[in-house]
Amino acid sequence: MALLKVAPSRLLSRALQLTSTLQNCTATSIAARRNFHFTVYGRKDTSAKVSDSISTQYPVVDHDFDAVVVGAGGAGLRAAFGLSEAGFNTACITKLFPTRSHTVAAQGGINAALGNMEDDDWRWHFYDTVKGSDWLGDQDAIHYMTEQAPASVIELENYGMPFSRTEQGKIYQRAFGGQSLKYGKGGQAHRCCCVADRTGHSLLHTLYGRSLRYDTSYFVEYFALDLLMENGECRGVIALCMEDGSIHRFRAKNTVIATGGYGRTYFSCTSAHTCTGDGTAMVTRAGLPCQDLEFVQFHPTGIYGAGCLITEGCRGEGGILINSEGERFMERYAPVAKDLASRDVVSRSMTIEMREGRGCGKDKDHVYLQLHHLPPSQLASRLPGISETAMIFAGVDVTKEPIPVLPTVHYNMGGIPTNYKGQVITHVNGEDRVVPGLYACGEAASASVHGANRLGANSLLDLVVFGRACALSIAEECKPGEALPSIKENAGEESVANLDKLRFANGSTRTSELRLNMQKTMQTHAAVFRTGSVLKEGCEKLSVINSAMDDLKTFDRGIVWNTDVVETLELQNLMLCALQTINSAEARKESRGAHAREDYKTRIDEYDYSKPIQGQQKKSFSEHWRKHTLSYVDSKGKVSLEYRPVIDATLNEDCASVPPAIRSY
């Protein structure tokens, strides 16, 4: 409380004094050894100005950069050092130290048609990804990603990523779900490059290490509040420094959002507690649309009772799912791919087994993942992390007994709509329009390469390909050092007012209580299987919960490391994502990919692709559902929906588009 009595100018003075002392100390201690490229406080020669134009209660600092990246996971780091490498004065804002980002938790691998295990072709990878998306993916973006995949993996290898190897010294590639050879006619593909079962950990640390070569200014433990938008253009970001409570406005010609997904809208998920849809919500508050948020991936194998991820790589190495009768039940649901069918197919199959009484345990509410038939040496070399995780969270020795698993929320296919260059788009009068100065990549974005369902090991690929694409696109559009667009003197005023409102919120409901209500509503009303009545009830419940945001109570009135307020800011972001997710799901009256409606069990395309389309009348755009959902939320929490067409054309003649067909494995 004593801090409240100190003038903001004095607080800022103290903070800058401490910063200067630490920087000088660091520079002195290591200058003799090497040039110092990294500091959590940003580059030493960065010009920053103190302002009181939007608040007299908080220190406000203005920064100018060519580009600012929000988020320092795989996508954010790749975008940030790509921009710095091209000569752009770049800031990277992150609420976590970079290596704490959720990319670190990815286990299975990264897809690329290297052909190290058998002949492969990136066009076959393209086909599998389009099919996996249930024909909701944009084929120009999928073309770009799969064609760039081999070069992206080789680039990572050159950066020092320690891939697992074959006996011949090549990058080891394992089987993964939904992957095939020869356009689905050549059997199972081995396309997933991995570092045992800790691929995300290696990827993130490799990219972070690479990023230290460049003079990117990192602002670590800064919470991005909102975009600075003027006249339909993005001109930067406003953020809160959590360490000292100061406000920072980053004016930039280009802004890249790489803030990850919003898995924490659900009660049980594999996501870190920091996956709160911050960038998605920032875009929503800016009046821009989000795309396809109803498509939430349930990973088939989360540890029962804990929700921790058990990688698909287990099944790629030969693991099998069994029910209470000891039956390898996936043989009934996917006779060809079996346990390596696409994730949405496996999750639904597991749920059906449990519903029909063939689940395991006394409550019949999970199934088993069996690994103990595999050689212990294989488990030790290929799945060491899983062996450890299963012992810690399930008390299971994988060499002797099966792991109890059930479907768990894992990934968000939807996000901020972009084109294949990473440029954020809106849809106006039937046409896609680029939002000047705004880019997005990674799980925060929807390019849309995943459509209605993501293939395993395409997410890490998405990060590096489109993180790099954002940097390349900005380099095509701009030059380093160009004049920056102006911002209004009071830009960000509403963000600071909201922060202050939450800091002194004195209602009757705790943030944690409201968050739990939201998460349990999403868990029960927008699950693996969905029905109209349950979704509608969920929409109504979430609307009530959102209204209760006005009755929040926070307890910490300070400005230094006020985690109470930060969690409440994250709840605001989660709520915007949850509202759009469940309303979009209620409106989509079909089953496609991860969106499975029990009252609308079939996919509704422009034609009935179960039979020849010759002689069929093509459905109008309003009559079918092979289209992207665009969702908006107004200041009162009301969701409105629009739709935009799926892009079926590829980038060029090197790759033919894949027409819709019945999806089976």
Swiss-Prot record:
Pathway: Carbohydrate metabolism; tricarboxylic acid cycle; fumarate from succinate (eukaryal route): step 1/1. GO terms for cellular component: mitochondrial inner membrane; respiratory chain complex II (succinate dehydrogenase). It is found in: Mitochondrion inner membrane. Keywords: Electron transport, FAD, Flavoprotein, Membrane, Mitochondrion, Mitochondrion inner membrane, Oxidoreductase, Transit peptide, Transport, Tricarboxylic acid cycle. Residues 1-45 form a transit peptide. Oxaloacetate binds at residues 299, 343, 410, 454, 457. InterPro entries: FAD-dep_OxRdtase_2_FAD-bd, FAD/NAD-bd_sf, FRD_SDH_FAD_BS, Fum_R/Succ_DH_flav-like_C_sf, Fum_Rdtase/Succ_DH_flav-like_C, SdhA/FrdA/AprA, Succ_DH/fumarate_Rdtase_cat_sf, Succ_DH_flav_su_fwd. It is an enzyme of class 1 (oxidoreductase). It is a peripheral membrane protein. The modification Tele-8alpha-FAD histidine is found at residue 102. Its main location: mitochondrion. The active site is at 343 (proton acceptor). It catalyses: a ubiquinone + succinate = a ubiquinol + fumarate; (R)-malate + a quinone = enol-oxaloacetate + a quinol; (S)-malate + a quinone = enol-oxaloacetate + a quinol. FAD binds at residues 72, 75, 94-95, 101, 103, 108, 224, 278, 443, 459-460. Its EC number is 1.3.5.1, 1.1.5.-. Pfam families: FAD_binding_2, Succ_DH_flav_C. Enol-oxaloacetate inhibits the succinate dehydrogenase activity. Belongs to the FAD-dependent oxidoreductase 2 family. FRD/SDH subfamily. Flavoprotein (FP) subunit of succinate dehydrogenase (SDH) that is involved in complex II of the mitochondrial electron transport chain and is responsible for transferring electrons from succinate to ubiquinone (coenzyme Q). SDH also oxidizes malate to the non-canonical enol form of oxaloacetate, enol-oxaloacetate. Enol-oxaloacetate, which is a potent inhibitor of the succinate dehydrogenase activity, is further isomerized into keto-oxaloacetate. This is Succinate dehydrogenase [ubiquinone] flavoprotein subunit B, mitochondrial. The gene is sdha-b.
